[in-house]
Amino acid sequence: MAIISSRDTGQNAEGPKRRQQKSSAWRKEGRELSFAGERGADPSALLQPQAHPGEAQEESLRPRTLAEYIGQTELKEVLSIAIAAARARQEPLDHLLFYGPPGLGKTTVAAVLAAEMGSQFYMTTAPALESPRDIAGYLVRLKRGDVLFIDEIHRLPKVTEELLYPAMEDFRLDITIGKGRSARITSLPLERFTLIGATTRIGALTSPLRDRFGHVQRLRFYEPHELVQIVLRTARLLNVSTDPEGAAEIARRSRGTPRIANRLFKRVRDYAQVRGDGHISQEVAAAALELFQVDPMGLDWIDRKLLTVLVEQFGGGPVGLETMAAVTGEDPQTIEEVYEPYLLQIGYLQRTPRGRVVTPAALRHLGYEAQSPLPLWS
């Protein structure tokens, strides 16, 4: 019996006839989906958790202390203990690794840690550290207790990563001088510093690098009530009149992600200013987000397209990732890292050994109803 991987195949496990039979088990209730994004607009950009090029978050919106940091309660407790212990011993923090979907605040919490420790904060990204010279430039200028933050740390070049091993473990920088038989290694002592890494793909990190972090912590999606607090805080800092119901409407469509919540808030603010009196109520927020094609569950047209294609062309699945990408025209990595995490989180999609499967909850949300029993979930 052949097992078809959800990643390794671009073809669905079932033939056209079987797919047609399964698709006939479904009919759409009442309405058709309109993929407005295919007509030129791209409202889906609002819901992408990655920071947009040129998108700058006002520094005033960033929390500066753990007390100001909303959400991630368990993580904050762990970090507060680590900070208190390090302060008592008058030592730098152990190295930390944060992982989780984009937009959850990994960079922000790293900056908060540096501020809590009274340390200088240096920030870079792994793709910017192309050669050993790049990382060495940071390491040699770090003072005791300084924090070096590397985003997308899973993308470090191997030669750069290997240079970090002795730096993290023994606080020394090994430099090779010369070439061939005349080459020799010189070690330079480094000040005790704290390295904080952030990644959306912890499985892509090598074991030697991952094992050198004293703390490995996951950031989870935010609860709606936490996002309401974040939206109200943003409204207060930006001096925008917002009632709790309006904040709740924005929060529940924000895919559990603070970055998206703040982005949606700014678009609703624009709408309220132009179409209303500037006040954000529940009605104003709902009207604005409907205009931007963000539905009450936080799905955009691409989310609905992915789910609808699975239902109407493949009877709900299972479907391999490469097949989904080919049919929808989306990049496989984009589907896996941008769209799938939230669909999995809210229970609209399942991963199985044979591929992706749409759940009954997603079918109800999209307005489908079953005409016959489904073998694919049995």
UniProtKB/Swiss-Prot annotation:
Feature: compositional bias, Polar residues: 1-12
One cellular component term from this protein's GO annotations in UniProt: Holliday junction resolvase complex
Region spans: Large ATPase domain (RuvB-L): 13-222
Small ATPAse domain (RuvB-S) as annotated region, ranges: 223-293
EC top class, as a word: hydrolase
Enzyme Commission number: 3.6.4.-
Protein keywords: ATP-binding, Cytoplasm, DNA damage, DNA recombination, DNA repair, DNA-binding, Hydrolase, Nucleotide-binding
Domain of life: Bacteria
Location in the cell: Cytoplasm
Pfam families found in the cross-reference section: AAA_lid_4, RuvB_C, RuvB_N
Catalytic activity line of the entry: ATP + H2O = ADP + phosphate + H(+)
GO BP field: DNA recombination; DNA repair
Chief location category: cytoplasm
Positions annotated to bind Mg(2+): 107
Record-level Gene Ontology MF annotations: ATP binding; ATP hydrolysis activity; four-way junction DNA binding; four-way junction helicase activity
Ligand binding (DNA): 351, 356
InterPro entries hit by this protein: AAA+_ATPase, AAA_lid_4, DNA_helicase_Holl-junc_RuvB, P-loop_NTPase, RuvB-like_N, RuvB_C, WH-like_DNA-bd_sf, WH_DNA-bd_sf
Region annotation Disordered: where it falls in the sequence: 1-62
Residues annotated for ATP binding in this entry: 61-62, 103, 106-108, 169-171, 212, 222, 259
The keyword ATP-binding appears for this protein: yes
Family membership noted in the UniProt record: Belongs to the RuvB family.
Domain observations: Has 3 domains, the large (RuvB-L) and small ATPase (RuvB-S) domains and the C-terminal head (RuvB-H) domain. The head domain binds DNA, while the ATPase domains jointly bind ATP, ADP or are empty depending on the state of the subunit in the translocation cycle. During a single DNA translocation step the structure of each domain remains the same, but their relative positions change.
Function: The RuvA-RuvB-RuvC complex processes Holliday junction (HJ) DNA during genetic recombination and DNA repair, while the RuvA-RuvB complex plays an important role in the rescue of blocked DNA replication forks via replication fork reversal (RFR). RuvA specifically binds to HJ cruciform DNA, conferring on it an open structure. The RuvB hexamer acts as an ATP-dependent pump, pulling dsDNA into and through the RuvAB complex. RuvB forms 2 homohexamers on either side of HJ DNA bound by 1 or 2 RuvA tetramers; 4 subunits per hexamer contact DNA at a time.
Official protein name in the record: Holliday junction branch migration complex subunit RuvB 1
